[in-house]
Amino acid sequence: MVKKLYDLLIAYVEHKLESVRYEIIGAEKRRAEKRTTDPLDGTERMVAEDSVRLEVEIPRGNGMFSRVRIKVKLLIEEFPISDTDLEEEIFTCIFRNLKITYIASTNDHTVYFKADGCRIYRNDDIDIFKEI
């Protein structure tokens, strides 16, 4: 199997970003219609998928990734922290199974991420505030 430079770059970025403790900037609730196929009869139908898109920033001290902001999609219905709390306090998180899902070919080369969940911390505490 031939290694592809693109696959190596993706794996490198995912590896470097998987254990970073991000500062949570904001959360946006989203609903999208997804096409799904019934495994029993093969019919296609549209299903609503709720998600939350977290905007986070990589803190200083992480080399070339320092101060980079990314948006990460979480397949949850509701984010447990309100916008008001995010403005008043600092919350950080570590994502579980962070993956790059798509890189746009447009001029801005937007990179899309998703994660299976995250651990949320209040301020710089070592105790977990919430796990989703």
Predicted regions and their residues:
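OB-fold and OB-like single-stranded nucleic-acid-recognition modules
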Residues: 1-132
